[in-house]
């Protein structure tokens, strides 16, 4: 007689405790169903699972925290980090929406926050990477890549000039090098510069900062020093660069200010160094130059933190409030008149102005009627 199959009706399997006379209760779950549960997902089920996970993640990101400080942090992250981990095509599309001016020679964009202009260690995506894609979006698939005419720091926003031809890019670069381009930046400062308008012309050099966190910073290298109440000229360093910055306070409160800056020279981190070390008024969100001895989140007063809706432990989320507000390019190529280009403030900058009680200058309203003044969309 053949042995009964495992799936035969009435078959009972003795357990290890059969010595006590107990039997397993027949399982209602078949071996077939177990095999089905361990079977690899087919394409449809996998797609449904991925969609569900994506929707769940999106819901988490859209969920508004109940804690007001966390809400403020989420807002800052949204304004400053949304373009740092996107596909190159997405970034190129966003840059195309930020075009301030376009002609047969130039394309001028409003550079977003947090994007480096060039690649380097740890850089996943930069503006130069997507210039070929942007050119094709604007002029078709046969278009040659756009060329950079100058650079802005990763954390700086505002007017940035690109050229269609390499020769034109070199001409614009020469205008910058020979100081023929008039540049205006806006910055929110911690504390108020005194006097309210003036010129900082202290040379700048790069120096290593010793300590637990060894790093390099740009610093001041004055040409004079005080000796027994007298100003004495010191020997110039070969590593020091001439640096000149004109500034004017546009609006102020007892603890902060909106400052317009006109760099005459173009030294690395010039505006940040002149404000932080020359005027003792670091830019809001400048976590590098607010303290010479270390790299750490900027320390702010309790009053400033309260206005910004943050705690000191969350100060690291505050972005650098430095914006390339305006450029004036002289006549160049086929253009017979100067080109004035200006762009609006980024959202986080404008919100900080309101929170800190700083006013937009009235004279800025009339600038929108000037010839060749192109406002960012």
UniProtKB/Swiss-Prot annotation:
Q: Where is the transit peptide?
A: 1-35
Is the Amino-acid biosynthesis keyword given for this protein? Answer: no
Family from the record: Belongs to the pseudouridine synthase RluA family.
GO terms, biological process: mitochondrial tRNA pseudouridine synthesis; mRNA processing; mRNA pseudouridine synthesis; positive regulation of mitochondrial translation; RNA splicing; rRNA pseudouridine synthesis
The cellular location(s) given in this protein's UniProt record come to:
Mitochondrion matrix; Nucleus; Cytoplasm
Keywords in alphabetical order, please. Answer: Cytoplasm, Isomerase, Mitochondrion, mRNA processing, mRNA splicing, Nucleus, rRNA processing, Transit peptide, tRNA processing
Q: What EC number(s) is this enzyme filed under?
A: 5.4.99.-
The taxonomic lineage of its organism, from the top, reads: Eukaryota, Metazoa, Chordata, Craniata, Vertebrata
Q: Which InterPro entries match?
A: PsdUridine_synth_cat_dom_sf, PsdUridine_synth_RluA-like_CS, PsdUridine_synth_RsuA/RluA, RluA_PseudoU_synthase
Q: How does it assemble?
A: Interacts with 16S mt-rRNA, mt-tRNA(Phe) and mt-tRNA(Met). Forms a regulatory protein-RNA complex, consisting of RCC1L, NGRN, RPUSD3, RPUSD4, TRUB2, FASTKD2 and 16S mt-rRNA.
* Record-linked SUPFAM superfamilies: Pseudouridine synthase
The record's Pfam families line, in alphabetical order, gives:
PseudoU_synth_2 (PF00849)
Catalytic residues of the enzyme? 153
Which coarse location class applies to the principal site listed for this UniProt protein? mitochondrion
**Family annotation (PANTHER family):** MITOCHONDRIAL RNA PSEUDOURIDINE SYNTHASE, PSEUDOURIDYLATE SYNTHASE RPUSD4, MITOCHONDRIAL
A GO cellular-component term linked to this record: ribonucleoprotein granule
Enzymatic reactions:
uridine in 5S rRNA = pseudouridine in 5S rRNA; a uridine in tRNA = a pseudouridine in tRNA; a uridine in mRNA = a pseudouridine in mRNA
Protein function: Catalyzes uridine to pseudouridine isomerization (pseudouridylation) of different mitochondrial RNA substrates. Acts on position 1397 in 16S mitochondrial ribosomal RNA (16S mt-rRNA). This modification is required for the assembly of 16S mt-rRNA into a functional mitochondrial ribosome. As a component of a functional protein-RNA module, consisting of RCC1L, NGRN, RPUSD3, RPUSD4, TRUB2, FASTKD2 and 16S mt-rRNA, controls 16S mt-rRNA abundance and is required for intra-mitochondrial translation. Acts on position 39 in mitochondrial tRNA(Phe).
Gene this protein is translated from: Rpusd4
The identity of this protein, by name, is Pseudouridylate synthase RPUSD4, mitochondrial
| Protein species of origin | Rattus norvegicus (Rat)
């Amino acid at each position: 007689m053949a042995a009964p199959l495992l799936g035969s009706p009435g078959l009972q399997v003795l357990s290890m405790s059969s010595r006590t006379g107990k039997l397993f209760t027949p399982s209602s779950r078949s071996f077939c169903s177990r095999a089905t549960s361990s079977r690899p997902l087919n394409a449809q089920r996998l797609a449904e699972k991925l969609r569900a996970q994506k929707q769940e993640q999106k819901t988490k990101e859209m969920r508004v925290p109940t804690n007001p400080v966390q809400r403020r942090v989420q807002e800052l992250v949204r304004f400053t980090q949304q373009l740092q981990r996107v596909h190159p095509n997405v970034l190129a599309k966003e840059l195309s929406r930020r075009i301030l001016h376009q002609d047969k020679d130039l394309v001028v964009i409003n550079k977003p926050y947090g994007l480096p202009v060039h690649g380097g260690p740890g850089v996943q995506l930069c503006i130069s990477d997507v210039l070929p894609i942007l050119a094709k979006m604007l002029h078709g698939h046969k278009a040659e890549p756009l060329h950079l005419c100058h650079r802005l720091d990763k954390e700086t926003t505002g007017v940035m000039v690109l050229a269609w031809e390499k020769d034109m890019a070199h001409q614009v670069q020469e205008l910058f090098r020979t100081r023929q381009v008039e540049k205006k930046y806006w910055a929110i400062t911690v504390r108020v510069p005194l006097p309210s308008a003036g010129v900082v012309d202290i040379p700048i050099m790069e120096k290593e900062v010793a300590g637990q966190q060894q790093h390099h910073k740009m610093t001041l290298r004055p040409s004079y020093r005080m000796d027994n109440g007298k100003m004495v000229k010191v020997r110039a360093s070969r590593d020091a660069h001439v640096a000149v910055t004109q500034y004017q306070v546009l609006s102020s409160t007892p603890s902060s200010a909106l400052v317009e800056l006109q760099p005459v020279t173009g030294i690395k981190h010039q505006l940040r160094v002149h404000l932080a070390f020359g005027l003792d008024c670091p830019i809001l969100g400048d976590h590098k130059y607010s303290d010479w001895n270390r790299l750490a989140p900027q320390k702010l007063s309790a009053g400033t933190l309260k206005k910004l809706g943050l705690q000191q432990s969350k100060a690291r989320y505050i972005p650098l409030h430095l914006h390339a507000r305006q450029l004036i390019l002289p006549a160049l190529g086929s253009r017979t008149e100067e080109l004035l280009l200006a762009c609006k403030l980024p959202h986080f900058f404008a919100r900080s102005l309101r929170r800190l009680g700083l006013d937009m200058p009235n004279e800025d309203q009339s600038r929108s009627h000037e010839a060749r003044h192109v406002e960012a969309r």
